[in-house]
């Protein structure tokens, strides 16, 4: 599986099958990336999510992309870093849920943001490490998946994720 790390707008990835939404428990329009995904997808996305709320910590859900250029949206719920005893565990579970949903739906390409680093206050370096660790085990959970694109907001986040990815790659190989 190929991991791409880019600075880019997650709602403008037309060559990707599913975008990943860092969702709140109620699966409602929020701010940041979740807000951008909901706005771009249109009101049907929130309507489609309603019956599945509240989404459990670490869980995921797949819905159509509606007005997005992507057929699917995978919603995952990580934990608030500050108000939770095991935020790293739930971040890992959310990312694993994302991979399982991709596999179960024969999705070959995903675009995800820096899960948890906005409203959930995850330290970006920790989020980057956990994300890269899970992605380097993706073949176990999602053998069908070919490409994962991590879409980040700026060069500083790009540098953090590239560094974490290189670090995880070194430990996996060595």
What role is predicted for each listed range?
Residues 81-174:
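Phosphate/ribose-phosphate-bearing ligand recognition and processing surfaces
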Residues 1-105:
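Glycine-/small-residue-enriched capping loops at alpha/beta junctions
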């Amino acid at each position: 599986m190929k991991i791409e790390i880019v600075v880019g707008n997650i709602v403008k990835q037309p060559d990707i099958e599913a975008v990943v939404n860092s969702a709140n428990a109620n699966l409602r329009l929020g701010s940041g990336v979740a807000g951008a995904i909901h706005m771009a997808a249109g009101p049907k996305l929130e309507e489609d999510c309603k019956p599945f709320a509240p989404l459990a910590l670490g869980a995921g859900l797949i819905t159509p992309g509606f007005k997005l250029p992507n057929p699917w949206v995978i919603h995952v719920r990580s934990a608030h870093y500050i108000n939770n005893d095991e935020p790293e565990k739930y971040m890992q579970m959310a990312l694993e849920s994302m991979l399982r949903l991709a596999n179960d739906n024969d999705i070959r390409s995903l675009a995800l943001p820096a899960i948890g680093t906005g409203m959930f206050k995850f330290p970006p370096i920790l989020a980057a490490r956990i994300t890269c660790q899970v992605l380097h085990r993706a073949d176990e959970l999602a053998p069908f998946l070919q490409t994962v694109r991590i879409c980040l907001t700026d060069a500083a986040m790009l540098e953090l994720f590239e560094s974490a990815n290189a670090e995880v790659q070194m430990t996996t190989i060595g």
